[in-house]
C-alpha cells in the first residue's frame, strides 16, 4: 500500500513538473519550434540533441519508418523524432539521462506496420500492449540497447503494459509520447483553422 501511494505521489509530482516546464517552454517560444518540427518546417537535424541519436536515425531500419503513416497526419519516423527531442529536452532540464532518453525515444515505436491496418487475431494482444515489446526486440537486433533504454521502450505505454516503469526517464516518455501524439494530430487542424481565419480576414478587409 505504501508503494502504491508513493508511486501515485511521484506520478502526480512528475505531471506537475512537466506541465510547468512545458508552460515555460511555451513562453520561451520553444514549444512553437517543436510544433514546427512536427510539421517539418524546422530542421530538427541541426539541433544540438541530434548528435546523441545520429547513428540510430541515419540507419536504414529507422529511415524505413518514414513510409508508414502514424497518428493520421504524420509518419512513425517523424513521431519518434519528436518524442526523442522532447525526451531530451525534459530529461536534460531535470538532470536525468537525456542521452539515453533521446535514443530510446527514437526506438520506442520501431515496428513496420500501420496500426490502423493491423489485423488482430484471436489471442493476440492489442497494438498498445504489443508494440512496445516488439519495438524493443527490433531495436536489440540492430542497435546496442542499454537496460535503461530497454525499460523506456517497453514501458512507454504504461499503464497498459502493467509493469511499473523502473526509471525516471521511463515515466517521462509515458507523458511525452502522448503529448507528441496530441501535437501531431492537432497541429494540422490548428493550421487549417488559422489559414481559414486569415483568408476570411483578408476577404473582409477587401
Q: Predicted segment positions?
A:
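Metal-dependent phosphohydrolase cores
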Residues: 9, 13-206
Amino acid at each position: 500500500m505504501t508503494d502504491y501511494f508513493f508511486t501515485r505521489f511521484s506520478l502526480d509530482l512528475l505531471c506537475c513538473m512537466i506541465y510547468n516546464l512545458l508552460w515555460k517552454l511555451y513562453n520561451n517560444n520553444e514549444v512553437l519550434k517543436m510544433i514546427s518540427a512536427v510539421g517539418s518546417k524546422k530542421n530538427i537535424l541541426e539541433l544540438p540533441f541530434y548528435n546523441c541519436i545520429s547513428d540510430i536515425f541515419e540507419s536504414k531500419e529507422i529511415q524505413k519508418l518514414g513510409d508508414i503513416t502514424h497518428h493520421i497526419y504524420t509518419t512513425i519516423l517523424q513521431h519518434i523524432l519528436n518524442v526523442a527531442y522532447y525526451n531530451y529536452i525534459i530529461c536534460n532540464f531535470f538532470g536525468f539521462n537525456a542521452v539515453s532518453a533521446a535514443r530510446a525515444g527514437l526506438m520506442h515505436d520501431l515496428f513496420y506496420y500501420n496500426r490502423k491496418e493491423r489485423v488482430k487475431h484471436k489471442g493476440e494482444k492489442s497494438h498498445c500492449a504489443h508494440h512496445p515489446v516488439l519495438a524493443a526486440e527490433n531495436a536489440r537486433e540492430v542497435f546496442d540497447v542499454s537496460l535503461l533504454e530497454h525499460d523506456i521502450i517497453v514501458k512507454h505505454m504504461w499503464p497498459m503494459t502493467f509493469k511499473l516503469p523502473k526509471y525516471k526517464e521511463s515515466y517521462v516518455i509515458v507523458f511525452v509520447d502522448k503529448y507528441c501524439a496530441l501535437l501531431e494530430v492537432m497541429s494540422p487542424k490548428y493550421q487549417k483553422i488559422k489559414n481559414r481565419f486569415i483568408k476570411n480576414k483578408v476577404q473582409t478587409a477587401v
